[in-house]
């Protein structure tokens, strides 16, 4: 585990299970339908879920017969994922606390997986420094077998500029900053800062190519409405 702090850990520690009450988490089944249809994954395929959070995509993939390893920087979220996996006896899902920036140096997970997912700013796009997103992509690339496939979502810079009037968008870095209130299971409110790395399609192509990926497709999607 990296000794580098990540701002998201405090948010996860406050929200815990309440994270799964947020509306953007309700489209998990449809998103997994899309992932399986797009990748052509078969029962028993090996997935890594980078920035898995409390495991909503990992667990759904495991229910469909995939073998999944989820990693996340938040121990609180990993604990939730492990608890829910055990409750459903999903022996084909495992969860590990690991900073996605350190995946590139975590040899036990290298060249192991058929597919990778990194969705809803679980890791990619939660970094304030562009170099960290590059590190994450390089680590994902190293975790995949030859010809492995990554499905990743990133926040659209054009959408952020047009629709996030209350956020501060830094055009030079592509980072959007805003403050918002989050609630935990007890309804306790905490005001927090959010930073989101936003990308144009061209920027995604460039950063993915730097990490050794070939782009197969870029689509505009919304939570629970993934399509090509």
Regions found by a protein language model. Name each.
Residues 1-42, 44-51:
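Conserved class I S-adenosyl-L-methionine
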Residues 147-211:
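SAM-dependent methyltransferase
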Residues 58-103:
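Class I SAM-dependent methyltransferase SAM/SAH-binding core
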Residues 133-146:
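A short glycine-rich, Lys/Arg-flanked "PGG" loop and its adjoining helix->strand segment in the class I
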Residues 114-132:
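A short SAM/SAH-binding and catalytic strip from SAM-dependent methyltransferases
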Residues 54:
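Conserved SAM/SAH-binding loop
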Residues 106-115:
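A short acidic, Gly/Pro-enriched loop at the edge of an enzyme's catalytic core
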């Amino acid at each position: 585990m990296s000794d580098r702090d990540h701002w998201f850990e405090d948010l996860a520690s406050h929200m815990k299970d309440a994270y799964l009450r947020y509306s953007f988490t309700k489209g998990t089944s449809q998103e997994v339908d899309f992932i399986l249809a797009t990748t052509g994954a078969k029962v028993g395929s090996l997935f890594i879920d980078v920035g898995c959070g409390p495991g909503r995509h990992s667990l759904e993939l495991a229910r469909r017969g995939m073998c999944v390893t989820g990693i996340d920087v938040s121990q609180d979220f990993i604990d939730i994922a492990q608890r829910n996996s055990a409750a459903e006896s999903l022996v084909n899902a495992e969860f590990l606390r690991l900073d996605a920036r350190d995946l590139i140096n975590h040899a036990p997970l290298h060249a192991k997986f058929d597919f990778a997912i990194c969705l809803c700013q679980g890791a990619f796009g939660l970094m304030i420094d562009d170099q960290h997103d590059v590190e994450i992509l390089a680590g994902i690339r190293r975790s995949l077998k030859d010809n492995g496939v990554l499905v990743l979502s990133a926040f659209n810079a054009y959408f952020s500029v047009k629709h996030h009037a209350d956020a501060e968008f830094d055009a030079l870095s592509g980072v959007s900053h805003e403050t918002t209130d989050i609630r935990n299971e007890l309804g306790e409110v905490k005001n927090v800062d959010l930073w989101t790395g936003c990308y144009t399609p061209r920027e995604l192509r460039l950063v993915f190519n730097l990490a050794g990926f070939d782009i197969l497709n870029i689509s505009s999607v919304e939570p629970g409405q993934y399509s090509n």
